[in-house]
Design a protein with these regions (language model features):
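Intrinsic low-complexity, intrinsically disordered terminal tails and linker regions enriched
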Residues: 2-210
Length: 210
């Protein structure tokens, strides 16, 4: 699924603004990107999540979240989230359920496992795992590249809301650079065709679609 943001800046415009030391654009862009996708679990580390899932499975009423439908959120508080009313308490419980469910799904569906990806003469993972992790989002002032905060080396970036709704393996990335766009187009074309396509054929296909 590809989402276009109306009025969005081009990758070059974003790069120029990010590298402007006099602008607060960089800070706002980082805040936005960190709010919509992440490369880590919500409730803790991989070890924490595994422990939580193992404990949850001991409950006779536990259900594998990849085999269930999502629970919709309760009605919002009409008093600007007072924190004391029934709606606020129900939403707090729902949010806790949301966080644990998302982490459970990620643990089951999104963790990369080295099965079949090492069958090459270099003995390296074809999917380039483990990925580099970043304790904080970093901005490379030499080229404007953004390395988004990422705590788990065996996870791609995800959007919690999408994971909660789809309830299976989903990856989410931001196409804010020419490099990212080329990488995703190449990945999708290879995934569909199962054989490498020439670059000009890839972009011709994109042109014909739009």
């Amino acid at each position: 699924m590809l989402l276009w943001i109306r009025g969005a800046l081009t990758p070059q415009e974003i790069r120029d603004r990010i590298m402007d030391p006099e602008s607060d654009f960089q800070k706002k862009m980082v805040e936005y990107l960190e709010s919509v996708h992440k490369g880590e679990f919500i409730t803790g580390s991989l070890e924490d999540v595994k422990k939580n899932v193992d404990i949850a499975e001991l409950d006779d009423e536990y259900k594998n979240p990849t085999e269930t439908l999502p629970i919709p959120p309760p009605l919002q508080c009409n008093q600007n989230e007072c924190g004391e009313c029934k709606s606020c308490k129900e939403n707090s419980l729902w949010q806790t359920q949301f966080n644990s469910t998302v982490d459970d799904i990620l643990f089951r569906s999104n963790l990369h496992k080295f099965t079949g990806c090492m069958s090459n003469k270099w003995g390296k993972c074809k999917a380039h795992f483990p990925r580099k992790t970043f304790e904080h989002t970093e901005v490379d002032m030499n080229n404007g590249a953004l390395n988004i905060k990422k705590g788990e080396s065996m996870l791609n970036t995800v959007t919690a809301e999408v994971t909660y709704l789809i309830r299976s393996n989903t990856d989410v990335t931001s196409l804010l650079s020419g490099t990212a766009i080329k990488a995703v187009v190449a990945y999708v074309s290879d995934y569909i065709s199962k054989s490498a396509l020439k670059t000009y054929l890839i972009f011709e296909a994109v042109k014909n679609v739009f």
